[in-house]
């Protein structure tokens, strides 16, 4: 479908007028709500700057969502679904104007059972954890143990559950449970079709993952049912090392230690700690200047194991706070990990950008050492230890790059590939050019089922232009598609 800007703008205005009882935003806030952290990439900054929706709507109920979706389908107006806009490569930025469907007011925790919870897509993850950590009352009326999400991004204060599912990968906690796509993490989703008379369908795993990490291009997710982790009192610590190799080997040993209950292990090679110390004054004294730092979260009852591992590798604990102290301060070192590291570093050095990499489990330590030796100070090493989907310990990289040119940035990513390191390119906004790597027929078929007019976040899914060939291949038996419920 071609989207003529003036026609889309008129259609959006008509929809807003006809649904005047909903919360519509049409003033200059629309520009801010049309953006995410795309500017982490100098390439995306050039490509996406200035894009904006024609209006933003903030529905509070499923009926309100249904009314907006039905009206957009009748008028042929594109819809871009938004959580809190904490993505990093334009996931929620509309290429063709239209309506931003902001789900941040659709935010109820629906229920919690031992090990499983269900919530509306717009719930903020910090709020979901806060409610679940209070515990569940059993049949005898006693308060049971608390629960928490298995993995959250460093933006957990504002990021939504649906946003992580639609635009994210994993995060803090993935050291135990792997990425969100690991079997057992997402158990089901309730999704709405984009039609004049929208339909609602429950997808159970594994089909529930067909809408995961595709930027809301192939279905509108209303609710998610996810596996939960036991809530522990987390001790936060920073361990500093003079040697990069010692810091890396310590991080790997701690991450791999089965008897130490942990939630996060992050390696920040020099000079990243110095950049953070400059960017965040409250961090003064928490890291040694010029050092390589490992940020860790372990259960308080595992502190002895942490200290033993620190001594084994010759590290120094330069920061330590109990769970009670973290709660009282309302500050957590989680917000210096994952892409918060990138955000803080760029405050000091605006010439930095980053890449996303995945090492090979079992070879990740050797690969990380080899890449640092090969690329030197041009690439600043930031590693997050996680489990793979299959359960092996590994690490993902969010390396900081001293940007010189698009050509050199692409060369650096290719050097990693040539050394067996997977790259999920964060400098592209097309689904297949990033983590997916290729057209996924199941993703396209799912979009055909849920979004037959192609109104959801148009322009982000390359496979949509190949849908007729994909269906022909499926009919001829050349492609096997996932089984989706009929509706």
Residue ranges, per PLM feature:
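General beta-strand structural signal in soluble alpha/beta enzymes
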Residues: 24-28, 58-59, 79-83, 101-103, ...
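Conserved glycine-rich FAD pyrophosphate-binding loop
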Residues: 3-4, 52, 77, 84, ...
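Short amphipathic alpha-helices in soluble, non-transmembrane regions
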Residues: 15, 72, 250-257, 302-317, ...
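N-terminal flexible segment immediately upstream of the FAD-binding catalytic core
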Residues: 1-70, 86-116, 272, 277-283, ...
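FAD-binding subdomain of flavoenzyme oxidoreductases
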Residues: 110, 125-126, 133-138, 142-257, ...
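A conserved active-site cap/scaffold subdomain adjacent to cofactor or substrate pockets
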Residues: 243, 254-256, 261-263, 268-321
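Helix N-cap motif at beta-to-alpha junctions
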Residues: 243-246, 297-304, 360-364, 401-406
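Short amphipathic alpha-helix segments
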Residues: 246-277, 361-378, 405-413
């Amino acid at each position: 479908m071609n989207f003529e800007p003036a026609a889309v703008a008129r259609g959006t205005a008509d929809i807003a007028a006809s649904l005047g009882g909903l919360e519509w935003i049409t003033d200059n806030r629309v520009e801010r709500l049309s953006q995410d952290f795309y500017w982490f990439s100098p390439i995306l900054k050039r490509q996406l700057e200035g894009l904006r929706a024609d209006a933003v709507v903030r529905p509070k109920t499923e009926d309100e969502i249904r009314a907006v979706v039905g009206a957009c389908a009748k008028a042929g107006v594109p819809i871009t679904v938004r959580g809190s806009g904490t993505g990093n490569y334009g996931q929620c930025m509309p290429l063709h104007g239209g309506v931003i469907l902001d789900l941040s007011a659709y935010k109820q925790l629906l229920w919690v059972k031992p090990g499983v919870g269900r919530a509306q897509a717009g719930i903020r993850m910090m709020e979901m954890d806060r409610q679940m950590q209070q515990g569940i009352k059993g049949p005898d009326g006693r308060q049971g143990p608390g629960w928490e999400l298995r993995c959250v991004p460093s933006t957990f204060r504002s990021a939504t559950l649906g946003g992580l599912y639609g635009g994210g990968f994993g995060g803090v906690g993935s050291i135990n449970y792997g990425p969100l796509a690991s079997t057992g993490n997402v158990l089901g989703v309730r999704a709405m079709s984009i039609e004049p008379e929208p339909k609602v369908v429950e997808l159970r795993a594994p089909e529930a993952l067909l809408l995961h990490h595709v930027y809301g291009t192939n279905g509108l997710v209303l609710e998610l049912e996810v596996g939960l982790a036991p809530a522990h009192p987390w001790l936060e610590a920073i361990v500093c090392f003079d040697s990069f190799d010692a810091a890396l080997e310590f991080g790997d040993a701690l991450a791999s230690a089965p008897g130490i209950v942990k939630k996060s292990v992050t390696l920040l090679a020099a000079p990243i700690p110095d950049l953070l110390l400059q960017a965040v004054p409250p961090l003064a004294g928490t890291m040694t200047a010029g050092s390589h730092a490992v940020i860790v979260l372990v259960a308080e009852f595992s502190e002895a194991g942490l200290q033993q591992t620190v001594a084994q590798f010759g590290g120094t604990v330069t920061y330590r706070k109990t769970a009670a102290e973290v709660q009282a301060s309302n500050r957590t070192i989680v917000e210096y990990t994952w892409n918060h590291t990138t955000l803080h570093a760029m405050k000091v050095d605006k010439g930095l950008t980053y890449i996303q990499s995945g090492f090979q489990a079992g070879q990740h330590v050797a690969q990380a050492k080899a890449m640092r030796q090969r690329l030197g100070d041009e690439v600043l090493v930031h590693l997050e230890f996680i489990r793979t989907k299959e359960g092996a310990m590994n690490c993902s990289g969010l390396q900081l790059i001293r940007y010189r040119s698009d050509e050199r940035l692409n060369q650096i990513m290719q050097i990693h590939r040539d050394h067996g390191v997977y790259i999920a390119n964060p400098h592209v906004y097309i689904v297949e050019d990033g983590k997916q790597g290729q057209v996924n027929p199941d993703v396209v078929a799912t979009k055909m089922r849920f979004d037959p007019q192609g109104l959801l976040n148009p322009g982000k899914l390359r496979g949509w232009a190949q849908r007729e060939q994909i269906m022909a291949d499926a009919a001829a038996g050349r492609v096997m598609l996932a089984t989706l419920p009929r509706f």
